[in-house]
């Protein structure tokens, strides 16, 4: 019984963009007993979540309508003077922490999506951009973002990477 209570305390819920929540839930492993997303310790997201973990105050706000449940990392240090954070006690993620986590997940999402699109262009476009977007949406079961929004996102990114400069026309003078 004590183990189950402790496991339930090891999760925290946050509210982020729906498509990012779908992406991270389908990309990472779900912990079967708690239903939280289990983040591998080798990722930057693990350390972002660990740094944002705090003890709940007596007047902390309980987030309603959360769409992402995170299985909190347990990183106990064995060195003197560097205590770890026990997730049973440090199980609160503030709204600012949720924003940081959302920013990092958006960074992961955009990196993977843009990498796929640019890879397709570098290979001579064996697939249409629309097909690459559809494959990406199908792979991560994204229902809350449209393919057009992803294409527009990529076109904006490509424009920032490779800005088009208008051609300078010079009027030819008669010979």
Region locations from a protein language model:
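Short Lys/Arg-enriched helix C-cap and helix-to-coil transition segments
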Residues: 161-175
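Short, basic interhelical loop/turn and adjoining N-cap
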Residues: 135-151
């Amino acid at each position: 019984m004590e183990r189950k209570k402790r496991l339930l305390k090891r999760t925290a819920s946050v509210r982020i963009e729906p498509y990012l929540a779908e992406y991270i839930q389908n990309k990472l492993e779900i912990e079967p007993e708690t239903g939280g997303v289990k983040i591998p310790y080798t990722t930057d997201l693990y350390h972002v979540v660990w740094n944002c973990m705090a003890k709940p105050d007596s007047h902390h706000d309980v987030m309603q309508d959360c769409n992402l449940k995170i299985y909190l990392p347990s990183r106990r240090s064995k060195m003197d003077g560097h205590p770890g954070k026990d997730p049973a006690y440090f199980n609160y993620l503030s709204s600012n922490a949720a924003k940081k986590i959302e920013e990092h997940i958006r960074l992961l999402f955009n990196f993977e999506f843009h990498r796929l699109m640019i890879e397709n262009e570098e290979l001579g476009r064996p697939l249409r951009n629309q097909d690459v977007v559809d494959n990406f949406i199908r792979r991560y079961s994204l229902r809350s973002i449209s393919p057009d929004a992803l294409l527009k996102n990529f076109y904006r990114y490509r424009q920032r990477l490779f800005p088009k400069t208008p051609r300078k026309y010079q009027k030819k003078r008669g010979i």
